[in-house]
Every structure is written in C-alpha cells, then in structure tokens.
Amino acid sequence: MEIAGKIACFVVLCMVVAAPCAEAITCGQVTSNLAPCLAYLRNTGPLGRCCGGVKALVNSARTTEDRQIACTCLKSAAGAISGINLGKAAGLPSTCGVNIPYKISPSTDCSKVQ
C-alpha cells in the first residue's frame, strides 16, 4: 500500500474513533424541560414558559429510542404526580403548536412510538 493510501486509512480510522457518541435522552432532561408546565397542568398557574420546554423536548427527542424514552418518562410522570389534569397533559403538544407521535397519558404504549 502506498503512503497516501496508508495516510487516508489512518485519517478515516481517527475520524471513526474520535466521532462523538450520541447519548440517549434521559428522564432528567424530560422532567427539566417540562418543569415549567407543572403549575399549568395542575390548574394552578398559566401556560407561561411551558411551551418553550415542550419545544425543547421535541427538538431533543430526534431518534425513535429518544421518543420512546421521553414517552416512558412522561407516562410515568402523568401517573405519579398528583393533581395533574390529564386532559391538559394530553393536549399540551397541540396547545404549544408541536406534534409528538404519542399521547401524554398513563395508558400510552410507548413501545409502539416511532
């Protein structure tokens, strides 16, 4: 193999090794993004900054795995946090002008989210 070929192989190898690994979204990120929505979802406060968090979450959940993780976190929160208006939770994406491929509900089957 000539020297130029070896250099090309080395450069490609370095690019593969140095490529950053994309990490999946976490429940911490999901809850952090949606924390401003809690008062609204409990009927105790305005929508306020909630939609900014919803939009940030949608932008963060780019892969199927991310969307399934986000769905699972939201499903768990919807069932565990007392006083949440589940109708408002389900309508949150449309209220904020975004689309998500699942309903925010304790009954959502997150394994089917694409």
From Swiss-Prot:
Cited CDD domains: nsLTP1 (cd01960)
Molecular function per GO: lipid binding
Entries under SUPFAM superfamilies matching the protein: Bifunctional inhibitor/lipid-transfer protein/seed storage 2S albumin
Tissue-level expression: High expression in leaf epidermis and shoot apex, and also in root epidermis during seedling germination.
Signal peptide range in chain numbering: 1-23
InterPro entries: Bifun_inhib/LTP/seed_sf (IPR036312), Bifunc_inhib/LTP/seed_store (IPR016140), Plant_nsLTP (IPR000528)
Biological process annotations from GO: defense response; lipid transport
Disulphide connectivity of cysteines: C27-C73, C37-C50, C51-C96, C71-C110
Keywords annotated in UniProt: Disulfide bond, Lipid-binding, Pathogenesis-related protein, Plant defense, Signal, Transport
Function, in words: Plant non-specific lipid-transfer proteins transfer phospholipids as well as galactolipids across membranes. Binds cis-unsaturated fatty acids and jasmonic acid with a higher affinity than linear chain fatty acids. Formation of the complex with jasmonic acid results in a conformational change facilitating the LPT1 binding on the elicitin plasma membrane receptor that is known to be involved in plant defense induction. May also play a role in wax or cutin deposition in the cell walls of expanding epidermal cells and certain secretory tissues.
Assigned protein family: Belongs to the plant LTP family.
Protein name: Non-specific lipid-transfer protein 1
Source organism: Nicotiana tabacum (Common tobacco)
